[in-house]
Amino acid sequence: MVSLLSCGTSASSHIVKKALTRLSLAMAAGLCFNLAAQEPTPPIITPTSPSVTIPLQTYADEQAIVKSANNLNTETKVRFAKTANFDSDTVVKIARKLAQKPYVELKDPLPPGLAKISYDEYRDIRFKPEASIWKAEGLPYQMQLFHRGFYFQDLIEIALVEGKQASHLAYNSEFFTAGDVLSQRLPTQDIGYSGLRIHYPLNNPAYFDELMVFQGASYFRALGKGSDYGLSSRGLALNTAEPEGEEFPIFRAFWVERPNTDSNLIVVHALLDSPSVAGAYRFSVRPGENTHIDVEATLFPRVDLVKVGLAPSTSMFLHSMNGRQNTDDFRPEVHDSDALLILNGRGERLWRPLANPKQLQVSAFMDNSPQGFGLIQRERSFDAYQDLEAHYERRPSLWVEPVGNWGAGEVVLTEIPTDSEIHDNIVSYWKPKQPIAAGSEFHFTYRLIWGSEPEVDDGTVIVARTASGRAEIAKATPRRLFVIDYQVKEGNNDEIPVAKVQSSAGVVTNVVVSRQPKTNGYRLAFEMDPQDAELIELRAELKFTGPRDVETWLYRWTL
């Protein structure tokens, strides 16, 4: 069973149910999960440090209790997030050592009663807000933990870091409440956790909102001010949409640095592992209108990583005004993201609306040293969605800014057919041109921006809306009508541009550009006759007499 991301107990039931019941992307694509059972082998790292259950006290008290645990006789075996010295290279050293040995599938079975609990029973296990880490100290952040159970079977280790010292955070049943639905007691032994979430007064200085969640494989997600949980990021993507099946690395352990009282920065370190690669990650999180997360990662491949995706994002697209064939839904649009935006190495802005295709499809956009890319939720009007529970207009965009020169490669977009909004079916990532060699150390850095999409300069012309339908109302026809509305950002639209529309097949006719007063921009309309083609790549550009920053519209039409 693939671990899936939970958005926490405080989110709406709609969002929680989607997160807990979403299928893996490989399964949604009709692929197999590529982690075959292996023969038991000795553990990679011999555990030496004991762990301890930490009662609900101040951090200073927690430190004293952890130190006193050295004399305790405990059966808990801490593999990674041990009570030990800690510095900026600690996780890198652990990942390097891990990669030097064959992968071992860790087996940490839950007690039988917890291993097979239902969705409703899992939801009945809640973290006590009063037990939040650092709550008693009045720090700008608090941390809560996720219990294991249901889809979340993997044991995740967590350590708290203060200065040069890491202290293992053992499982404590007193951190949780279990209601009448669960009808069983929580275990007393250290079973670990399934993830963590960071809280911060993002929207109200008097309330600690959920800010960021790590749970399920290498999935994580965050919020900007005023947004709701939507799309997710991952530590790494491997073999996405490949016939042999996708491989899902997992964050095995986290080290969370104690935040300072006078800073809005919190730092989380993570250890990644899978059959193909081990890795060390450092997340520097700064919340705000847009939440910025600086990611520093070092990969240690066990095998050549050929089909690897860096900075992957995972989202959902069910339908929009661009193609609602066979859609019986009162809501005009249903999606967490409506397009892929790319700012390539040449400075060209590419806008590629998403699709829910009949068959799995993969698009690749070749580039050299991209400036940024991401899955964007540009439509912010409630009227576009009409969903009082899901509120898709509040879902964040996720923009990826590479730091340094990422060289040659391609932005890859994978679109998977789905018939339900609870299934994530969109993936984007950067694929380097050259494989990452086995035995090497591959370091890369990037920034994730959660919230609004990147600001553009005044006068920039961006795509505001894409719609399509049959070209004739009175009778059926294979010809398609495309209507693209553009918006001028804080500028005038005195000049009517000339449109250049290209297609890889078929015939494009009746190209018309007019003013669109509702967007302070333009409307481009054209017809496309596919003729015998089953797949057509479309490209539309607006040409002005002088220099102007204009988004290039791209789309893949399929029969």
Curated annotation (Swiss-Prot):
Annotated localization: Periplasm
Pathway(s) annotated for this protein in UniProt: Glycan metabolism; osmoregulated periplasmic glucan (OPG) biosynthesis
Entry superkingdom: Bacteria
Gene Ontology BP terms: beta-glucan biosynthetic process
GO cellular component, one term: outer membrane-bounded periplasmic space
Pfam families: MdoG
GO molecular function: carbohydrate binding; catalytic activity
UniProt signal peptide: 1-37
Keywords on record: Periplasm, Signal
SUPFAM superfamilies found in the cross-reference section: E set domains, Galactose mutarotase-like
Family, similarity comment: Belongs to the OpgD/OpgG family.
Role summary: Involved in the biosynthesis of osmoregulated periplasmic glucans (OPGs).
The name this protein goes by in its record: Glucans biosynthesis protein G
Phylogenetic lineage: Bacteria, Pseudomonadati, Pseudomonadota, Gammaproteobacteria, Alteromonadales
Gene: opgG
